[in-house]
């Protein structure tokens, strides 16, 4: 246990930050799952784009708050964008 008042305060601050970081990471995971669910359900392209934008927004919010490294975020967004593009191409192939 910390003895100094500043160390006690840091324990409190770290708990708060850990909680908020956990919430932010959970938002990212959930938004990515929703995006992938839209792709799996073979839904409309508009739904997929909306889900992609939501996931991308949550990922970038994590970067701005320091929860996630920018390179990790870029890799995740790139992967999701590639899946969206493949989904778009598959829809174009089936519509013709």
Swiss-Prot record:
One of its GO terms (biological process) is translation. One of its GO terms (cellular component) is small ribosomal subunit. Pfam families: Ribosomal_S20p. It comes from the Bacteria. GO terms for molecular function: small ribosomal subunit rRNA binding; structural constituent of ribosome. InterPro entries: Ribosomal_bS20, Ribosomal_bS20_sf. Keywords: Ribonucleoprotein, Ribosomal protein, RNA-binding, rRNA-binding. Binds directly to 16S ribosomal RNA. Belongs to the bacterial ribosomal protein bS20 family. This is Small ribosomal subunit protein bS20.
